[in-house]
Amino acid sequence: MTGETQLRARRTRIKILKAIAGLNRSAGFSEIRDATGLSTGSIYYHLERMNKYVTKDLRQYRITDEGLRLLSEIGVKSVVSN
């Protein structure tokens, strides 16, 4: 992966994390798609690689404590103060 591709992937994954965190730390796939504007394929691709930050429980994706820590570290405090 090139540096530019890695940066784009990170930005996409942060966008997904922010969307889930902003939806009370739990969201269905359609909610993630609507909140991010990303394609179905892109969301699935990234969610598969984010198991440290997002878990799937039945039909909901939930942000993990590690995902909340990451958002806090990058300065996204408004969505993680639950």
Predicted regions and their residues:
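Short, basic, alpha-helical segments at the C-terminal edge of helix-turn-helix-like DNA-binding modules
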Residues: 60-66
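Short helix-capping/hinge SLiMs at alpha-helix to coil transitions
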Residues: 20-24, 57
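Hydrophobic structural patches
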Residues: 17-20, 47
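A short, conserved structural fragment
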Residues: 51-60
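Conserved segment of winged-helix/HTH DNA-binding domains
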Residues: 67-82
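Short amphipathic alpha-helical interaction segments
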Residues: 37-49
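Short alpha-helical segments that sit at the start of domains
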Residues: 1-16, 40
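Short acidic, hydrophobic short linear motifs in intrinsically disordered regions
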Residues: 25-35
